[in-house]
From Swiss-Prot:
This is Small ribosomal subunit protein bS20. NCBIfam families: S20. One of its GO terms (biological process) is translation. It holds the Pfam family Ribosomal_S20p. One of its GO terms (cellular component) is cytosol. InterPro entries: Ribosomal_bS20, Ribosomal_bS20_sf. Keywords: Ribonucleoprotein, Ribosomal protein, RNA-binding, rRNA-binding.
């Protein structure tokens, strides 16, 4: 455990940020899972609606640095291709 006051403060801040980031990541994954569920069910219109919401969340997380921009692009392109396959 840290002995210096500033190090103690940093440890507290780091833990608070870790918990916040974990909840944000969990929320993002939930949006992604919703799109996968709609695709698996074969519901194109519902999948497209969920995809639009998922895009917003994933882009926001990428802009904040929670995930890499390429990971965000990978999620979006992968799901867009799956939605496009639905007839």
């Amino acid at each position: 455990m840290a002995n210096i006051k500033s190090a103690k403060k940093r440890a507290v801040q780091s833990e608070k940020r870790r918990q916040h980031n974990a909840s944000q990541r969990s929320m993002m994954r939930t949006y992604i899972k919703k799109v996968y569920a709609q695709v698996a069910a074969g519901e194109k219109s519902a999948a497209e609606a969920a995809f639009v919401e998922m895009q917003k969340v994933v882009d926001r997380m990428a802009s904040k640095g929670l995930i890499h921009a390429n990971k965000a692009a990978n999620h979006k392109s992968k799901l867009a291709a799956q939605i496009k396959k639905l007839a």
